[in-house]
A protein has these predicted regions:
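Alpha/beta-hydrolase fold catalytic core
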Residues: 1-37, 56-60, 85-99, 293, ...
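Active-site loop/oxyanion-hole signature of alpha/beta-hydrolase fold enzymes
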Residues: 16-26, 49, 53, 62-107, ...
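Active-site glycine-rich loops that stabilize anionic/oxyanionic intermediates
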Residues: 40-43, 106
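Flexible "cap/lid" loop of the alpha/beta hydrolase fold
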Residues: 126-164
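Conserved alpha/beta-hydrolase catalytic His-Asp/Glu region
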Residues: 163-234
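Acidic catalytic loop of the alpha/beta-hydrolase fold
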Residues: 225-226, 249-253
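Short beta-strand/loop motif that positions the catalytic acidic residue
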Residues: 238, 244-246
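Catalytic histidine-centered segment of alpha/beta-hydrolase-like enzymes
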Residues: 252, 276-286
Length: 321
């Protein structure tokens, strides 16, 4: 993984005011379809290092760290869903004159859906990997429900976050993988090391716990009450091609939610990966990449063409004169 040009060699703040401070250029041909990967709650660009090399033979892949996540400090910016959707939009405008394909996992899938609804011209297509979808309480795993409730109680959520952050980074990563994966041992050792490195760097940031608490409350408010119906309306307004990938063993967003979304949006392509949890791009990168590349050649072909810089140049009006 290489650092994108918005990152100074000394690791200082990014050079683009109002845009993400840290992002990764994961490779791929300059003329290939642009895929921008959007991580989930508490995640980072590292969430994509396993699957990206399997896509960069034909696609250009970038992955930003959203505000309050990864190595992008909030610095007074909001870390909730709406704020990071706006941040993503500015990032897209800064890296490409034309539309991109957004690939979002969990909260990143939600933010990608909202961006496609708010700015359809900026999004050629969506690849949703176990996205945060509208949920009813009965659909949730009891343990997951209990954790979410804790974060909604004033003071308790921050205390839980503070306790987690006192653990060594390796233990934090292991705990997240146990929750998010059906079989954590499937995640490659070098990928785990990269996540530990990011958390070790993030441990030096001030306000990281408050940033996470604000983000998780925002996600819960969007998928549940009071925002669920508004979120559903935004989802139904999305007109671009959509690939919905979902692990059948996901405890955070059950596969029944994905099946419901696919029924309600018949133009979407649903691909279930059996026996995999909430992060297929980490737990089953080969299967995930196979589904993505197949979609890009078939139902997502128009999205791939629209996201390719060469096509964007052809579509741009000729200069007068």
């Amino acid at each position: 993984m290489t650092a994108g040009p918005a990152i100074r060699p000394d690791g200082g703040p990014g050079t683009q005011p109002g845009v993400v401070s840290r992002w990764a250029d994961l490779g791929g041909p300059a003329g290939g379809p642009l895929i921008v990967c959007v991580h989930g709650l508490g995640g980072s660009a590292a969430n994509w290092v396993a699957v990206a090399p399997l896509l960069t033979g034909s696609c250009r892949v970038l992955a930003p760290d959203l505000a309050g996540h990864g190595l992008t400090q909030s610095r007074g910016r909001g870390t909730g869903v709406a704020a990071n959707r706006a941040l993503l939009h500015r990032f897209l405008a800064s890296v490409s004159p034309g539309p991109a394909i957004l690939m979002g996992n969990s909260m990143g899938g939600m933010i990608s859906l909202l961006e496609a609804s708010a700015h359809p011209g900026a999004v050629a297509g969506l690849i949703l990997v176990d996205p945060a979808l509208p949920l009813l309480p009965a659909q949730l795993d009891p343990l997951v429900t209990a954790v979410f409730v804790l974060y909604l109680i004033p003071g308790i959520g921050r205390a839980v976050t503070a306790r987690q952050r006192r653990q060594p980074p390796a233990r934090q990563v292991a705990g997240v993988l146990r929750l998010c994966c059906a079989e954590p041992s499937r995640v490659a050792a070098d990928v785990i090391t990269r996540h530990v490195q990011v958390l070790a760097q993030r441990a030096r940031f001030t306000g990281a716990g408050q940033d996470f608490s604000a983000a998780i409350r925002s996600v819960i408010a969007t998928v549940g009450c009071p925002g669920r119906r508004a979120y559903q309306r935004r989802i139904h307004s999305v007109a671009c091609p959509v690939l919905l990938i979902h692990g059948t063993g996901d405890r955070l967003v059950p596969v029944t939610a994905a099946r419901t979304a696919a029924r309600q949006n018949p133009g979407w392509t649903l691909a279930e990966i059996t026996g995999v949890g909430h992060v297929p791009q980490l737990e089953a990168p080969v299967s995930t990449a196979r589904v993505i590349t197949g979609w890009l050649r078939a139902a997502g072909r128009t999205a791939a063409e629209a996201a390719a810089p060469g096509r964007q140049e052809q579509a741009r009006p000729a200069a007068a004169g």
